[in-house]
From Swiss-Prot:
Belongs to the CDC123 family. It is found in: Cytoplasm. GO terms for cellular component: cytoplasm. GO terms for biological process: cell division. The lineage of its organism: Eukaryota, Metazoa, Cnidaria, Anthozoa, Hexacorallia. Keywords: Cell cycle, Cell division, Cytoplasm. Required for S phase entry of the cell cycle. This is Cell division cycle protein 123 homolog. It comes from Nematostella vectensis.
Length: 329
């Protein structure tokens, strides 16, 4: 994969060509100052100072919070202001019907949906958007290493970032599909929501494949600049399909129910179609660990052996006093 393949999947690169078959969207260029703000640690929303919350119902913590609030330097964090972007976001939200779905050039902050009040990416104000962007590791990777998997990757980074606001759609996850195009041929279709089993998908395989193939051949085929790529599509009940997004063909794009070695097989006799076959075949969602502290993720996955050793040592220290008392008794 080359950097140009990634650039071709940049939203503003493909949207003008496919705007008639995708969701209505607005593109807002981001200033360097705003991008730097997104890269900084911590979640301080623009517009007003961020005060530490009062935990009045928690008596055990009340004294601690009171001490913090009495110190102005600890109680209030100066918030940045981006009035121009703020105004553009408000105008775009109004033009798009009052509710939007945010993303940057390539990715949406799906891993941060847990922090919103309804566990979705539905946003009604600039503050909703800022909170999701600042809470997302996915967005951080887009900003810092968009070309990390490219064979012609260099020290030069992408420096033109955009906020994309898409008109909010109530999408039924079962009808989202990821489609794989190799050498200008649609070779595979995967269920997008692999963390759930939908019994009717396998039963309607022929209809689903026919509708998506027709959409590809009539609306997308040979119109995208690359010969191999991935696109996501939403299928409605009336055979209509809507384009959701484009992604590069290969890592880091998630092949979902396929593997890249399987998709790269020289001969693909027929269009491959995969869905979760039963409740037993359900896989964890790609952001299942996003709600856990990183230390907990490292412990459970074995990613950091040192943390696991420390954890076991602490456990031994905790048990020793009890064990000694048992022996004494």
């Amino acid at each position: 994969m080359k950097q140009q393949h990634v650039e071709n999947c940049n939203f503003s690169s493909w949207y003008p060509r496919f705007k008639n078959v995708t969701i209505r969207s607005k593109i807002i260029p981001l200033s360097k100052e705003f991008v730097d703000y997104l890269k900084t640690d911590g979640v301080v929303l623009p517009g007003k100072p961020s005060s530490l919350p009062r935990h009045e119902d928690d008596e055990s913590d009340s004294e601690e919070w009171q001490n913090l609030e009495e110190d102005p330097e600890q109680a209030t964090v100066e918030a940045p202001e981006f009035n121009d972007i703020d105004t553009k976001i408000k105008e775009a939200i109004q033009e798009l019907g009052g509710e939007v779905f945010p993303k940057l050039n390539w990715s949406a902050p799906r891993d941060a949906s847990w922090i919103s009040h309804d566990n979705t990416l539905r946003c009604k104000s600039p503050g909703d958007i800022y909170l999701l962007l600042k809470s997302s590791d996915t967005i951080d990777r887009v900003l810092c290493d968009a070309f990390i998997h490219c064979e012609d990757n260099s020290t030069q980074t992408h420096d033109s970032f955009e906020l994309i606001l898409r008109k909010w759609q109530n999408i039924y996850p079962a009808m989202e599909f990821r489609c794989f195009v190799r050498n200008n041929e649609l070779v595979a279709i995967s269920q997008r929501d692999i963390s759930n089993y939908y019994h009717f998908l396998a039963e309607n395989e022929d209809e689903i494949c026919a509708d998506i193939l027709n959409f590809y051949e009539s609306k997308i085929a040979e119109k995208f600049p690359d010969t191999s790529y991935v696109f996501d599509v939403y299928k409605y009940a009336d055979q209509k399909c809507t384009l959701i997004d484009f992604s590069p063909y290969g890592v880091p794009t998630n092949p979902l129910l396929f593997t890249w070695s399987e998709l790269d097989t020289e001969v693909v006799p027929d269009l491959l179609f995969k869905v979760v076959p039963s409740a037993i075949g359900v896989q964890p969602g790609p952001f299942a660990c996003s709600r856990l502290p990183q230390d907990m993720v490292d412990l459970t996955s074995g990613a950091d052996v040192n943390k696991l050793v420390d954890f076991l040592n602490v456990g031994n220290l905790i048990r020793r006093p009890g064990e000694a008392s048992d022996d004494d008794s």
